[in-house]
């Protein structure tokens, strides 16, 4: 049985793709063994991310560390997948000639054939094309290893924000046909999955073709998935404010399985910066979406992405971001220092803000967000939360770990038969990034 080591960088879409790589290899070889140490593997894969500069360089650092393994075992297969693969292509082979296969997100289904071609010809294989339809047509059924599962419903992005490489590495938006999505979710539900997380770089831009040739939009998809037997909770990520329609907002009113947590990236609270980013909305328009959502879901927890130090960002513009964060009360958000990505329009903009100032802004924004996270956690003490038990706690092997609808981790004392089940927990303690709870007796 082939032993496979895979390391995943970046977003949840990459996590989904890594699972699919393991699935196509398992189908090809009649099963595989996933190992946690590279030196135990027959196949080593790095599924890469190019959104941040450090993530990109980390890949080449990791490649350097596995090079001695290749020198000792020439039959070892080393592969680079994901967005760095799409962006760099043949350059990866030039920089690391011991790499055997390089493939993008849209060609992961071709991985087994690429390995065979490498072993037959002795030549490194590179395929970073964009055959979107092919990928979804050739993927095997999902492997189920828990009570929650990701389902990719669309790929790529057509928004072309000035700082972002996704349209260049994942291609234009492409939506899976509705029936394909529903079939995958129904199969997962039959295998015991209770929570579905719908994935896409711009998930709410979903426009899937139906059997009659009509188009199903994202709000309609949510309503259909809501009725699939066995599915008890629904999430989605990542959405774009430009596509956040009133019909999606109404789903939060009508669909109780849709969790009270939303990740909706805004990036900045400054209209000038948003315009320079080519985001396509103003801070006021974003706030209008949130007002509508909280009018029908007052308990909605909202997380977001922020970039500080975007070229030309002034102190006043950063203060506008701070004010927006306080006004909206964001929770559990992700803050990044701007990192210029090659080939994007923003990479050519003048940037005279010192790095030390960018770090200060990062820390200041994180401080405000973490304070709000702590406040929300405190308000949950004494409440009863419906939770999905994910497995053994990462902090204490004698405890179990569960997740609330608003995306909080809860550690509690339980029994192994509770894993992958939905249970009620009373929250007893609150920490910065987790909660402690106890089982509510029936």
Swiss-Prot record:
Protein name: tRNA-2-methylthio-N(6)-dimethylallyladenosine synthase
EC category: transferase
Protein family according to the UniProt entry: Belongs to the methylthiotransferase family. MiaB subfamily.
Sequence ranges assigned to domain TRAM in this UniProt record: 378-441
One function term, GO molecular function aspect: metal ion binding
Quaternary organization: Monomer.
Broad class of where this protein is predominantly found: cytoplasm
Bound cofactor: record note: Binds 2 [4Fe-4S] clusters. One cluster is coordinated with 3 cysteines and an exchangeable S-adenosyl-L-methionine.
This protein's UniProt keywords: 4Fe-4S, Cytoplasm, Iron, Iron-sulfur, Metal-binding, S-adenosyl-L-methionine, Transferase, tRNA processing
Cofactor (UniProt): [4Fe-4S] cluster
